[in-house]
Amino acid sequence: MLESDRLISSQSIVSEDAMDRAIRPLSLSEYVGQDSVSSQMQIFINAARKRNDPLDHVLIFGPPGLGKTTLANIIAHEMGVNIRQTSGPVIERAGDIAAILTNLQQNDVLFIDEIHRLSPVIEEILYPAMEDYKLDIMIGEGPAARSIKLELPPFTLIGATTRAGLLTSPLRDRFGIVQRLEYYSVDSLTQIVARSAHLLGVPTKPEGAREVALRSRGTPRIANRLLRRVRDYSEVKGNGIITVDMAQQALEMLEVDQHGFDLMDRKLLLAVIEHFNGGPVGIDSIAAAIGEEKGTIEDVLEPFLIQQGFLMRTPRGRIATSKAYQHFGFSAIEQE
C-alpha cells in the first residue's frame, strides 16, 4: 500500500492540485495558524520591501501537507514579485538550474520543493548563486571545457523539505531565514475548513467544520480532502448542508475515526493488542499479522501513531500504549 492510496494521506495528489490552488490563501492576513511563522515573515517581508532588497533565502521544513508551497506563494505575493516553482528531483543537469536562474527577474522568488533531493553538482552551482548572485558553469568537455561566469539579478531562494536532516550543512547554512511548520490545532483547522467550504460554495455549520477538523490529523491538506468527501455525502444523503451529524455519518462511512485513524491504523494497533498482548513485538511479526510490507508500516503507518502516543517503538519491539487500549475500549491492565 502506498501513502497516496489512503484518504488520510498527507501526500499531494495530482487530481487535487487545481482545487487546492483555488482555495489557497494569497496573503499572510488570510493565512490561518502558524502564528509565530506568520508574524516573523510579515516583519522580514516589510523590512525587505522598505529597503527594496530581495528577501533573505528561506528554508521551510515540516511534515507533508502543512502548507510549505502555500507559504512560498504567499511570500512571493506579499513581496510583489513573480515565483518560479520547481522541485529537487526535476533539476538533473547544470543546464537545468542555469536556465531557471538566468530567467529570474530582480527580487523574484525561486521555489524548490523537496530541496533535500538536489544532487551535489546542482548544490555546488547554487552556492555562489545564493551568496553572490553569480552563476559559474562549465561549458564543453575535456580540454575544450571552459568556465563561464554570469551575473544574476538579486533573487530569493525558498527551499521546502519534509526531511531537513538530509540537507547538507553548506546548503542549510546559506538560508538566512529558517521556518518550521507545526501540526495545526483543531481551532485553526476548523477555520481552514470553514474558509475552504465558503470558497467551494458548500454550506457548512460551525460544528460540522469542527468535526472534519477533529479527524484531519492536524493537516490542512487532509482537512480539505475530507471536506470534499463530506460534501459529496451530504449532497447525496442530505440537503447539501454539512452539519455535525452529516459529517459524522460521512466520516464513519469513510472509516475515519475521531482521532483521524483509518482502517489500516486500527488494524495495526489491534494486531499488537490482540495478537501479541500489547507487545513488545517485532516489525516483521506485525507485517505478517496484518499483511503489509515492513517498509509501509515504518514509513506510512507508524509515524502518526507514535506521534499521537498510541504506539511506542523500543529496542525490544513495538508496544501499544494505554491510550491505544482505551481507544478500543480495552482495559489497560490487559497490557501487562
Swiss-Prot record:
It comes from the Bacteria. Disulfide bonds: none annotated. It is an enzyme of class 3 (hydrolase). It catalyses: ATP + H2O = ADP + phosphate + H(+). Mg(2+) binds at residue 69. The keyword Coiled coil does not apply. It is found in: Cytoplasm. GO terms for molecular function: ATP binding; ATP hydrolysis activity; four-way junction DNA binding; four-way junction helicase activity. GO terms for biological process: DNA recombination; DNA repair. Residues 4-184 are annotated as: Large ATPase domain (RuvB-L). It holds the Pfam family AAA_lid_4. Its EC number is 3.6.4.-. Belongs to the RuvB family. Has 3 domains, the large (RuvB-L) and small ATPase (RuvB-S) domains and the C-terminal head (RuvB-H) domain. The head domain binds DNA, while the ATPase domains jointly bind ATP, ADP or are empty depending on the state of the subunit in the translocation cycle. During a single DNA translocation step the structure of each domain remains the same, but their relative positions change. The RuvA-RuvB-RuvC complex processes Holliday junction (HJ) DNA during genetic recombination and DNA repair, while the RuvA-RuvB complex plays an important role in the rescue of blocked DNA replication forks via replication fork reversal (RFR). RuvA specifically binds to HJ cruciform DNA, conferring on it an open structure. The RuvB hexamer acts as an ATP-dependent pump, pulling dsDNA into and through the RuvAB complex. RuvB forms 2 homohexamers on either side of HJ DNA bound by 1 or 2 RuvA tetramers; 4 subunits per hexamer contact DNA at a time. This is Holliday junction branch migration complex subunit RuvB. The gene is ruvB.
